C-alpha cells in the first residue's frame, strides 16, 4: 500500500503474542517498500524504492497505554530498521516521510467509531451471515475473554491456533465428529420462489416485482439509485437490521 489512512482500529494481541515478548506485541504497522531486489513482475517496477504516505491516528493497543496515546513512536517507527528489503533507506528517508500528518485518502460516506466503540460493534455484529453458528459464538467468546482454548501440540501448532475443525471436537458444542457445525434445516413456506430467480415470492410482491418473471431478478428497479440488482437488494434486506445497528453511534465522514 502506497498511501493509506489507518484510523480508530482496535488491536488486541492474543495469548500466543504474549509469548513473543518482542515489538510485534505492540505493532500498529510495519511500513516498508518494494526494494530494488524485489522481483515479482514488471507491474511492481514503478513502485520500487518509494516510501508511501500514511495517516495513522486514534488506534487502540490493548494493554499498552503508551502506544494507544502515541501510535507512531513504538507502534510504527520502532517496528522498522535499515535492511536489505528497504534498500537501507529507512533512517535516511522512510522514517521522515511516511507520517503525512493528515488524511492521505479522501474518504466520504464511511461511518467511523472510536476504536473502543468499534471493538464492541465488531463483537456484536461481525460476520458473513445473518445469524451466528456455534463456531462464530466460540470465536467471539475467545476474543472477548482473550482466551486460547485450542492447544494442540505438534508441528506448526501454537496456542490458540485452529488448523482444522476436528481439533475442536469436544471443545465446541453442536459439532459433528469432524468438527463441523450441525445445521438445522427448517422448511419455510414463505420462501416459495415460483420463477427461480433467487427472490422469494413474498418479497417480489412486496416490492412490485413479478414472481413469474425470472429476468427481473437481474434488473435494477428496486434500488432508487439504479446501482444494485433486485436480487442484491433482496439479499441486503436479510441483514439490513444488522447493518443499521453496526452504524449506530458512529460519525459519517462527509
What is each PLM-predicted segment?
Residues 1-11, 139, 143, 199, ...:
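Long, contiguous hydrophobic alpha-helical segments, chiefly transmembrane helices and signal peptides
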Residues 69-186, 190:
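Extracellular/surface-exposed low-complexity segments
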Residues 46-53, 129, 133, 190-194, ...:
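Short, well-ordered coil↔helix boundary/capping segments
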Residues 175-254:
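Extracellular calcium-associated, cysteine-rich motifs in secreted modular proteins
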Amino acid at each position: 500500500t502506497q498511501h493509506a489512512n489507518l484510523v480508530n482500529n482496535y488491536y488486541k494481541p492474543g495469548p500466543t503474542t504474549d509469548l513473543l515478548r518482542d515489538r510485534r506485541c505492540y505493532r500498529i504497522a510495519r511500513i516498508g517498500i518494494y526494494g530494488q531486489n524485489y522481483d515479482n513482475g514488471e507491474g511492481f517496477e514503478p513502485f520500487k524504492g518509494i516510501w508511501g504516505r500514511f495517516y495513522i491516528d486514534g488506534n487502540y493497543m490493548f494493554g499498552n497505554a503508551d502506544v494507544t496515546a502515541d501510535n507512531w513512536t513504538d507502534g510504527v517507527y520502532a517496528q522498522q530498521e535499515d535492511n536489505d528489503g528497504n534498500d537501507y533507506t529507512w533512517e535516511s528517508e522512510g522514517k521522515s516521510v511516511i507520517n503525512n500528518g493528515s488524511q492521505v485518502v479522501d474518504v466520504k460516506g464511511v461511518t467511523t467509531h472510536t476504536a473502543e466503540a468499534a471493538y464492541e460493534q465488531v463483537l456484536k455484529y461481525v460476520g458473513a451471515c445473518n445469524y451466528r453458528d456455534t463456531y462464530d459464538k466460540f470465536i467471539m467468546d475467545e476474543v472477548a475473554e482473550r482466551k486460547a482454548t485450542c492447544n494442540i501440540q505438534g508441528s506448526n501448532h501454537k496456542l490458540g491456533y485452529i488448523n482444522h475443525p476436528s481439533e475442536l471436537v469436544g471443545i465446541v458444542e453442536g459439532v459433528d465428529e469432524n468438527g463441523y457445525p450441525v445445521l438445522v434445516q427448517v422448511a419455510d413456506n414463505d420462501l416459495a420462489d415460483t420463477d427461480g430467480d433467487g427472490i422469494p415470492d413474498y418479497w417480489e410482491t412486496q416490492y412490485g416485482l413479478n414472481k413469474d418473471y425470472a429476468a427481473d431478478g437481474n434488473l435494477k428497479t428496486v434500488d432508487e439509485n439504479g446501482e444494485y440488482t433486485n436480487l442484491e437488494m433482496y439479499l441486503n434486506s436479510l441483514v439490513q437490521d444488522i447493518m443499521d445497528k453496526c452504524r449506530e453511534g458512529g460519525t459519517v465522514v462527509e
